[in-house]
Amino acid sequence: MQFSVGNIYQPSECHTCMDDQTFISTIKTGDKKKIEEMADDLWNYRDLYQRNALMISAMYGRTDLIEFFAARYDHIDDRDIEGNTALMWAVRNNRMESAKSLIALKCSIDIPDSAGNTPICWAVIFGYTDMVKLLISSGANINISNDEGDTPAILASKYGRSECLKMLIEAGCDLNAKNHNAQNVWKAAEAFGRKEILEVLASLSNGR
């Protein structure tokens, strides 16, 4: 399946005296007026990991700045050096309001990082049940697989995220999908000793 992904930023010469610490701290704690005055400098800067102002805003839950930067600059799906989008940073830091704001602004919800993990994959890995619920309700692909062939359901089995698995099952995920090690959800749960996952799977009427 082909994804419409944002550009991975290619660094160019910086024309400001800003550094990573100033860049991040300004977005993290700065007042809105100061940020508006520095808007162009902030947007044109990228940190060591090629993260832009929108990504840092999402990371620290600055929903007000997400809306500000997204309205000013049309790069909502740009990716950093590891392929993370602003939505990915919101998800990985469990910033619900940031994620909701980005989704409302029509960001792409299934852009994978450099390892093939999409936002819902990371939400499952960390066990962020509310985030998983949000992503499912927003149309995330629940059967997408990462570079190891792991679907969100297989990841839930590996990491013992039983509540996440229940949500995925309710949403109609494919329990028979296998990763590159020929593991489906049952085999993954067995391999990682996830008894709680096996109990969830045992409760299914169709069994293995």
Swiss-Prot record:
InterPro entries: Ankyrin_rpt, Ankyrin_rpt-contain_sf. Gene3D superfamilies: Ankyrin repeat-containing domain. ANK repeats lie at residues 49-78, 82-111, 115-144, 148-177. Keywords: ANK repeat, Repeat. This is Putative ankyrin repeat protein Ta0196. It comes from Thermoplasma acidophilum (strain ATCC 25905 / DSM 1728 / JCM 9062 / NBRC 15155 / AMRC-C165).
